Amino acid sequence: MNDRMPPNIEYQSGHGAGAAVSAESTVPLVVDLDGTLTPTDTLFESLVQLLKHSPMQIIRLPLALLRGRAGFKHFIATHSSISADYLPYRQDFLDYLREQKSKGRRIILATAAHESIANKVAAHLGLFETVLASNPDHNLKGTAKLQAIREQIGPVFVYAGDSSADLPIWRASSAAVLVGVAPAVAARVREEVAVEREFPKAGLEFKTWLRALRVHQWLKNLLLFVPLLTAFSFLDVEKLTTMAVAFLAFSLAASATYMVNDLWDLQSDRQHPRKRFRPFASAQIPIHIGLAVAALALVLSFVMSVFV
């Protein structure tokens, strides 16, 4: 048994959402924010808002990076604002936290996100008795977060996280709560520490990408082939090839535009009863992945247009 476990509490390691403690735990539960409490990354959320509302600050980003991670996060947070009210939260995990809170368990938010964001989330949810977060001088991640937890909470705690960056904290904890953790990382955690609960991450389905790319809108670009039909040139292989490349170029450019627009409208989409379920608004697809795919689609569209 983990030597950091209180003797009156028995933990069970296990697999799947059913892995649980066999007795109600009174050990403080320390919770991560990005990727755990919410599937999104609040730094990228803030960066998108900065680009949208303060585009001239882009020229200052390289200088902000020279300040280190803590300084960069502070710069982004200072020049942007995201609403904690409409962030996408992991509902199953949130329900678990509320259940534990109702039973008198101490719950602490410990995150590498900037303190301004963490405090907004804490105020909105009303679950946390203490907030530990990054500030202008310290980036609270990995071993730095572990040190802060030990100083504020003590050596006995359960930690809820989502990534390999949390491994040092899990190793020092009494037990782990795994939220959306990759199978390989989860296996490493189970080898070293008992697991209190697991909340598996839903897989990213192919149809989610189809929705994000708005592939159904590509049908409009089939109008490019109409001149071939009216000129009875639909059997001309060279012209068909040219139109096919043009079709793909237009379609990829349109998809990139739709994705950028969705990222631009994240906060407003989350307040809409239907749009809040879109892939980016619901954080089914991470922001940085969306930006990369949109950029790739634009590059491919440009390259194809050269040959049309």
Residue ranges of predicted features:
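C-terminal cap/substrate-recognition subdomain and adjoining C-terminal extension
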Residues: N2-A23, A84-F234
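Multi-pass membrane catalytic core of lipid/isoprenoid biosynthesis enzymes
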Residues: I58-I59, Q271-V308
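Alpha-helical transmembrane segments of integral membrane proteins
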Residues: F44, L219-L223, E238-A249, I289-V293, ...
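Membrane-embedded alpha-helical segments that form the functional core of polytopic membrane enzymes
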Residues: V226, D236-W264
